[in-house]
Every structure is written in C-alpha cells, then in structure tokens.
Amino acid sequence: MARYDLVERLNGTFRQTEHALATLTENLEQQPLLIARVFSLPEVTKEAEHNPLATIAVEQHLGKEAESLALRHYRHLFIQQQSENRSSKAAVRLPGVLCYQVDDATQAALENQIQHINQLKTTFERIVTVESGLPSAARFEWVHRHLPGLITLNAYRALTVIKNPATLRFGWANKHIIKNLRRDEVLAQLEKSLNTPRSVHPWTREEWQARLEREYQDIAALPQQARLKIKRPVKVQPIARVWYKGQQKQVQHACPTPLIALINTDKGMTVPDIGELLNYDADNVQHRFKPQAQPLRLIIPRLHLYVAD
C-alpha cells in the first residue's frame, strides 16, 4: 500500500507541476514583453552524447520568437517532444532571459507562481531520489514505468526569477567535481566491487575482476596517509552574470534555461542592458584567475582518481 501511495504522489505531483507550468506560461504571455534574448545550442545526438564538447555554436533569437522558444522550453518534459535523433541523456539547454514589465501586484503573483512550481519540482525530485528508497540505477526504470519518456533533469530543473537587473552578461563555465578521499575509503569501495563480480562492457566478468584487482593493489601500495582526489570534469555550462545597480552587487546564475526578469515600472525601473552569448571554443578559454594547480598523478582513470605527489 505504501508503494502504491508513493506512485500516486509521484503522478499527482508531476501533474500539478505540468498544470502550474501551463498556467505560468499563459500568464507570462499576457504581460508586456520588454525584451527577450535566448540562445539555442546544437542538438546533441545519441551517438555523441558522451563526447566532450570542444566547440559549441550558438544561434541567437530575439523578441517574440525568443519568448515562444523559452515558454515551450519550460514545458519540455518528455522525449516525445523532441527529435528522435536527439540524445535523451544530454541536457536540453536554452540560456537567455525574458524581461517583462510588471507592477507590484503582478510581480507578487508571478513570484508566487514560480516559487510554487519550484516547490513542486523539489518535492518530485525528493520522491524519486529519497522516498522511493531505490538505488540510482533502479530509479530510471521506476520513474519511466509510471511516466514513460520523462526527461527527469528537466522535471527537476528549477526556474530562476530575477528582479530589476541593470545588466546581464552571458558566458561559459568550465568546472570539475572535486572530492577528497582517504586511501582506506577507496580500498573499501574497490573491495565492495570485487565482492560483487559482474561484467562491464566491453570486458568479460573475469577481465573486469582482474582490472579491479590491479586497481586495488595500486591503491594498497600507497602510504595510508596518501592524499587522493576525484577530479571529474563537468561538461561546459552556460552562465549568466547579473548586475544590480542599486545594491552594487553581481550575482552569477547557472543558465540552462531562460531567466525570468521582472522589471517593476511602479518603482521606476528600466530595461536592462543584455549581452550576447558567444560561441564556445575550448582552445580559446580565457581564465580571469587560475590558481596554481596542485601536482596530481592520475592513478585510476575510470574514476578520475588522482594522488597528490
């Protein structure tokens, strides 16, 4: 019965999210659009979904065309809504911003709507990742049994609302996931894998077991106090840097989906200055500040595991 109730909540929360998104997009369409600028990125095919991106060509859209793309993007939740050739694993991203003229009452209503949508999205993600009690490998099958074709990342992804920005500038962020580990923690992880033999394509179970044993010996040979670090690259992400003149403050936002900027004319606010997102080229990345990197030696490539020399 508890599992049935959880499925009911999963479906109910998702349907509420769909309805709330539909209501929001209808309400936004009724507001005076001051300026809209979004940037579509190339479609990632199924064959290329794991390939690193050296370049990204950006196509700019303005005005009502940009608004239409953005409002459709907010409701893009299923693979059935996209090309059959597009990867269902690669995130669908549409950086940019929609700027609407609002008064005090409209601003409060839209902010409440967006907050409600984000609460529903958080609840939905918690049902899937926590309350289901399922390991990550089993969640995909469980969710898609009840919501076939769902793009879970799009369902989780929150909407970002900003108020009265002075300027917006778009760019790209290169990041790494960093995690420090002790030698014995890595040994325990490898030992767990050794005790549950399986095959991993393209290796047989015996070949994979032999690889794990070599990795175990390599780690066991290190001093107990060796400093180990997982440094896994994350695919380049579009970002927005927002400047607030009154507060003399800049805030950086991840920008996989268009920001919603509310410009309150009751308070005398004006249209912000919006920059362009340039094409990404990994060979020409310029770092504002790049600290001296700690010397690291790669010891287990598949885990992106390094040892500090």
Curated annotation (Swiss-Prot):
Domain of life from the UniProt record: Bacteria
GO cellular component entries: cytoplasm
Subcellular location: Cytoplasm
InterPro entries linked: DNA_replication_term_site-bd, Tus_dom1, Tus_sf
Presence of keyword Ubl conjugation: no
Gene3D superfamilies registered for this protein in UniProt: 3.30.54.10, Replication terminator Tus, domain 1 superfamily/Replication terminator Tus
Keyword annotations of the record: Cytoplasm, DNA replication, DNA-binding
Keyword Cytoplasm (UniProt): yes
GO MF term set: DNA binding
Principal subcellular localization: cytoplasm
GO biological process: DNA replication termination
Pfam family, one: Ter
Known function: Trans-acting protein required for termination of DNA replication. Binds to DNA replication terminator sequences (terA to terF) to prevent the passage of replication forks. The termination efficiency will be affected by the affinity of this protein for the terminator sequence.
NCBIfam families noted in UniProt: rep_term_tus (TIGR02648)
Similarity comment: family membership: Belongs to the Tus family.
Name under which the protein is recorded: DNA replication terminus site-binding protein
Origin species: Citrobacter koseri (strain ATCC BAA-895 / CDC 4225-83 / SGSC4696)
